[in-house]
């Protein structure tokens, strides 16, 4: 347990940031999964729609520092490649 006032504040800030980052990461994973499921079903329109929702969210997560920029770029690249091979 932290004893200093500043350390207590840091603990509170870390908890809030952790909750925010966990939510962003979880939502991002759900959106990526929706793209993969739509692509697996063979429905290109649905896959493109899901991709259009996922890409800005992944970019936003990278901008906020939740994931690395290169990781975001790699995820987007793989999803676009997957959607383009559907149908």
Swiss-Prot record:
InterPro entries in the cross-refs: Ribosomal_bS20 (IPR002583), Ribosomal_bS20_sf (IPR036510)
Compositionally skewed regions (Basic residues) per UniProt: 1-12
Gene Ontology annotations for the cellular component aspect, listed alphabetically: cytosol; small ribosomal subunit
A Pfam family reported for this protein in Swiss-Prot or TrEMBL: Ribosomal_S20p
Family assignment from sequence similarity: Belongs to the bacterial ribosomal protein bS20 family.
NCBIfam families xref list: S20
Listed name of the protein: Small ribosomal subunit protein bS20
């Amino acid at each position: 347990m932290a004893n200093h006032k500043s350390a207590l504040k840091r603990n509170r800030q870390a908890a809030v940031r952790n909750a925010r980052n966990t939510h962003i990461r979880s939502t991002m994973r759900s959106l990526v999964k929706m793209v993969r499921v739509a692509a697996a079903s063979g429905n290109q329109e649905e896959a493109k729609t899901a991709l259009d929702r996922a890409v800005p969210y992944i970019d936003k997560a990278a901008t906020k520092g939740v994931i690395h920029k290169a990781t975001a770029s790699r995820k987007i690249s793989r999803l676009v490649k997957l959607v383009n091979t559907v149908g």
